[in-house]
């Protein structure tokens, strides 16, 4: 290692063998004039043809300098590459506007016996509001990049000793793949001190045929803990409980079981954790497992006007790096150069310092949804910020492939939103009328779309919230079965294999654009109201009027029908939504009564939940839920 490059922050990494072009663009950009495609013999080396140009202005290899400027003690970073052949390395940076600035360039000539080491130090001072740094390689002869990386100029403070926690539920193959990836790279393997797997399913990870090999590489570091299905919050709470009680690990890394891991992401969040000015949560970003070049979001916040998660200012959902590269003049790409500050990070990849976990306590008993947001907000109240670090990411199933806004998860969305709002919603915008108004709007939309089961379980969500924090903990395991029982009585919650299971629709589908003109919106709304005041035609409950694709199932179409099939978000089945005037009015009145109670009692519930936070987040309280597993010896790999 050179005198300048003292501690690795981020390696240059290359695509896996056989990756498609759109995924390759997350790692490198090749000039269209190159005679042949660059080849990566390993994950950290690249063979480039003669008279070619390759840019590392990419998601995984550009350096997010503004984040390191804002959150760490680093004053500068060093690019260090080892190359053979003849060519040139040019270093560029950007401003927060996306404007590109040349930094410096170096010609190089290296041989197999003596590779050339090219180093460039980049001062971080100009990156207050945004900006990245990257390098390009232009070749004269064939060139091999043997290694490259971004380095700090001083040794990393603290200790690298991570407890990785992967709760799993009936995904043994996915979990085994994640375990295998943890030991696939020596640098990643050596920083992992423990791997904790709470197994909450019936199909056990240890029964998978590939488990013994994956477990053998982890050895005594791996522990499997069987426990009831307590959801993600119960799984992650077990991870934190075991990490604090039975390890000396200084970092706790939460990860989902159903992800595809980029192992270097672990090293990158660890590096930021170690160089951070003060303890903080460091999270990775999420790429779309089905469209791998698509980034879910640069970062998220909680909208304090309605207390709902949303994109952070200047961040947009679903950015496609294959279509809009980082170094692109498109307005969408320019937004990527701003530093995005967040309220929380999803627990698909999130590193929590041991010190923070010891001070804040356990996650809330929310089963799923909002537990990650709560912890980020709770940390901020204790002076611990959260950063969502670009270039550190995993691939996860996109939310667009799920019906979680209308299926059983809708219960947890609303109930837990209310719980977390009661815990953390303060300031001039903390007026529950905004939240209730947004819920009323959503309720009317659900009823117009014949999503009666959604309204029914959301009514239960309000009831359970108003019943108080002790009740919330008591139903940690039982709430989901109760929600399933409620949904079974509504046709819109019964999934059929295909629309062909029913008689053919009475009408062919017609294209309907969303209304934007206020007069047209008013007309469609009036038609829908008048239609819903009349009794439904029983014939349309035996034979649907339309077969509606999921993307077309909007209020302005469904509010004037009595029966229609709607395809599920994953495309694997349909539900037969049927209008029922009596049921609709009953659900509406029940919802309105509960919303009135929310308005009346929210201040009271705010005090009750805040008083209960120390108990809800305590190890002692969580032991009562984890007791069946706590009385067992964990199984080690």
From Swiss-Prot:
Instruction: Specify which residues bind Mn(2+) according to the UniProt entry for this protein.
Output: 256, 258, 396
Q: Which domain of life is it from?
A: Bacteria
* Chief place where the protein resides: membrane
GO MF term set: glycosyltransferase activity; lipopolysaccharide-1,5-galactosyltransferase activity; lipopolysaccharide-1,6-galactosyltransferase activity; metal ion binding; transferase activity; UDP-galactosyltransferase activity
In this chain, UDP-alpha-D-galactofuranose is annotated as bound at: 171, 200, 229, 256
Q: What is the effect of changing residue 413 to S?
A: 1700-fold decrease in transferase activity. No effect on affinity for the substrate UDP-Galf
Pfam families attached to this UniProt entry? GlfT2_domain3 (PF19320), Glft2_N (PF17994), Glyco_tranf_2_3 (PF13641)
Q: State its location(s).
A: Cell membrane
Q: Which InterPro entries match?
A: GlfT2_C, GlfT2_N, Nucleotide-diphossugar_trans
As its record notes, the protein acts as a catalyst of: beta-D-galactofuranosyl-(1->5)-beta-D-galactofuranosyl-(1->4)-alpha-L-rhamnosyl-(1->3)-N-acetyl-alpha-D-glucosaminyl-diphospho-trans,octa-cis-decaprenol + 28 UDP-alpha-D-galactofuranose = [beta-D-galactofuranosyl-(1->5)-beta-D-galactofuranosyl-(1->6)]14-beta-D-galactofuranosyl-(1->5)-beta-D-galactofuranosyl-(1->4)-alpha-L-rhamnopyranosyl-(1->3)-N-acetyl-alpha-D-glucosaminyl-diphospho-trans,octa-cis-decaprenol + 28 UDP + 28 H(+)
Cellular component terms per the entry's GO annotation: cytosol; plasma membrane
Q: Which SUPFAM superfamilies match?
A: Nucleotide-diphospho-sugar transferases
Q: What pathway does this protein act in?
A: Cell wall biogenesis; cell wall polysaccharide biosynthesis
Q: Which Gene3D superfamilies match?
A: 3.90.550.60
Q: Assembly and partners? A: Homotetramer.
Misc: Was identified as a high-confidence drug target.
Q: What does this protein do?
A: Involved in the galactan polymerization of the arabinogalactan (AG) region of the mycolylarabinogalactan-peptidoglycan (mAGP) complex, an essential component of the mycobacteria cell wall. Thus, successively transfers approximately 28 galactofuranosyl (Galf) residues from UDP-galactofuranose (UDP-Galf) onto the galactofuranosyl-galactofuranosyl-rhamnosyl-GlcNAc-diphospho-decaprenol (Galf-Galf-Rha-GlcNAc-PP-C50) acceptor produced by GlfT1, with alternating 1->5 and 1->6 links, forming a galactan domain with approximately 30 galactofuranosyl residues.
Q: What is this protein called?
A: Galactofuranosyltransferase GlfT2
